[in-house]
């Protein structure tokens, strides 16, 4: 059959933004690295030049998604956070890795989700309004507010977070069958699933897939 390159590899499990871009839109990030970042000088000409190269690369990557100021700012904030990750990372080498994973994962998730507001908004003013409602005046935190925090939705969100963070992705689930061309950007540790679950052509798996399919159809 046809094997395509990996393009997304559980990006929301990333513990920092550098790792996020190794996992997110792998073909695009590889293109930006090989044809923009490295030709600009990469990290070979000092920290300041590296940070400038990162910022330029991410801004151009933002414009690639669309010709609007929201995409420019989205790329810019990603470039700045990447530069900060490289700069401050050396100061945390003595911190236990397990602690870095927890704190880094939460910070990365918060930043990426906040930045998506810029990506999805039609203009800067709308993005600022959304962010103000999220952080400056978060009415959704009010007790009894009829927003997203209903009892049933809280359970669904917690379940989905656990699924996204702990269960293997499709490449890991079907890894024995080599469904895609592995990316060299990911290290072995990043490829290891937290839960060892592998698909097999068995009656049990067929039944599970049928249950999931029926659940999806009935939820339409």
Stretches found by the model and what they are:
Residues 2, 14-33, 37-220:
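Non-catalytic, membrane-anchoring transmembrane segments at the edges
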Residues 8:
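Soluble catalytic regions of membrane-associated enzymes that act on cell-envelope
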